[in-house]
Design a protein with these regions (language model features):
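A charge-rich, low-complexity, intrinsically flexible signal that marks solvent-exposed coils, linkers
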Residues: 1-81
């Protein structure tokens, strides 16, 4: 899991892990969510990967375009950081 830079200083995403056909996002509450090509879809996942690497706009994108359309909520974990 890599730390999300969050250049804007606002937002709920704290970390991410990019996989070939998916991305895992960690949020402020330490919950992790898997987004993949089947849900929410390839276009959204690829855009999320770009924003994650850029360190800006990911939380806004998730809130506006993805919301609860994730593949799976993963077990709550202790922070990776």
């Amino acid at each position: 899991m890599k730390r999300y830079e969050n250049r804007s200083g606002h937002g709920g995403v704290t970390g991410y892990e990019i996989l070939p056909d998916s991305i895992v996002l960690e949020f402020n509450d330490k919950d992790e969510y898997l987004y993949d090509y089947s849900k929410p879809g390839r276009e959204q996942v690829e855009q999320m990967k770009i924003l994650a690497e850029r360190g800006e706009g990911l939380t806004t994108y998730v809130n506006q375009h993805v919301r609860d359309n994730y593949r799976k909520k993963l077990n709550k974990k202790a922070s990776h950081f």
